[in-house]
């Protein structure tokens, strides 16, 4: 549950790309859907960094966690332990996928974000089936299917299977696949005179390597560009170790244990949902959603790095079976083993009715989340090479080790629950044919009861240990129970006014508050003095214009977040020494976005978007844990990883009624790669393209090209660079570093068969 990167707005269309499938919504009059309000749809899976996740566009705020909902409830309650990609994919089980706006999300869930709004196929009276198959040049095999139909006049059924076999763009040596995911869905629906009731079951089993295979070494040139290290091709060469056993200290008992790479990525969950939709005699629409999910395995592994250095004989580093000291490039590497068990019970009920010009909605959330989680960490030194060797460190006293620094870097533990009980109301009021007002409010009672270990971590840290710190304080390392009872609230107001048939204005203001969540207590956690309300205001305003050729919106946006909690691992520049520090800070972003849908002639469509934004840190201060390294004051610095300029261009053309060509261009402007804004990456284009051919009413074939400009580069942050100052930046010209990279040039092929 290490610190997550900064959050992102999700923009979607229903287009296939990467290792997760997407289905096209089928509109059928006699098909039972779950009755959601569908939002604007954009590219769901066009992600140039990760094939298993929806595409994300940054807006400069720390992540508010899960932004994917299935049948009106979170697909996973929190992705901090039970990750979204381990339990949800946009597959053939879904009837439709749309968006929830930030205003709706704030009121219905307490979270300000654009969110995926997905709904299951429930069936129809006639039999229908769909089979999707996808593959690519690297050997990816993806299969998913759904069958649905009628059992009798009053009963419907649905069943789906999803299978993903993804080796990635290179083969890991310690396992066959970088992502192996299985999803199974089954459900029955009983048709009522004025509604329906459905029971759905879902089973997920998934293993994903994640950051174990998503990092690589490169040469940072110094001007924002990177070069490949000779013999190491970014995106197609593995920086994960060969395999074999490793040693770690279990944070739960302090025992030294052994494990295998890939053995700590098991995820398994059972889920049962009930959906009830009914139209009452007085015109009220009643929608009830309930879900129980049990994930006895919610595990994953994180890899991290520090500084790359040139090893000498004096470092006493050796490859296996060699008595000659290693004298090549090496990097201090870190590993976190995350072990979790998750269980939640979720209920949402809504009653809605139209009164004259008012559309009123009254809702209730009762969401319970139980978490049992811990992580252990260790450090090792590896060669900077493809499939790096883990080097043995030999000491003057005759001892040696490969793995060290046990639980020195942010081992975590928490066990407990949180519960949200909320009442909300919304009203869409058509004041006049030209003026519409939308407003809503939410009041939430939040209770958390969780174990916390508030003590500074050190090498050998574990539950049950007794430790004396540098200041002479001796403590017993054991959990302490934290109980919080708080009220959260959210409110929103939007107004739109249409001056003419074509031209209008729109403005909205939304605010949501919350207190620290259970996952934020897994580290040292906030003290009582640090426990403060998190407030997120969002204010937007702009113009709209629409005619037969163009649909345009241009808006100015302000959004901020106070008291954000972040656990940051910092490295002493030029070394492999690292420490963990808890940070509480704010962020604010002012931006301007213009989006347009353009239809200049029949068959051609262009989606275009331009964003300029300025996300900056507030009250961001790191007291340096290293002698000789100054403290860091990042106030006013641009948020790392967040580009100030974003451009989207998505042209498509229907050559015939059955053949469609499409392209997708994403430009991400200059992004800073560390907190001090000393290091940065130049702007880059992420590109996709494809063709879809509806051969007949049963068969559709397609091809997709990812990164067709074949750009090779790094993105995100640079390992070990957190405290490098602007004055020191010049020293890092043509410097060896490591970080994440773009997906390589890939061609994918798809076939869909409907019957």
Role assignments for model-derived ranges:
Residues 11-12, 148, 537-541, 637-755:
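Conserved C-terminal beta-signal and adjacent last beta-strands/turns
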Residues 56, 68, 84-87, 97-99, ...:
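N-terminal periplasmic accessory domains that precede
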Residues 73-101:
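Short acidic/polar hinge/loop motifs at secondary-structure boundaries
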Residues 267-296, 325-460, 496-498, 508, ...:
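Face-selective signature of the C-terminal outer-membrane beta-barrel domain
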Residues 342, 361, 365-367, 412-561, ...:
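Structural signature of Gram-negative outer-membrane beta-barrels, strongest in the C-terminal barrel
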Residues 558-561, 578-676, 697-698, 750-754:
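Gram-negative outer-membrane beta-barrel transporters
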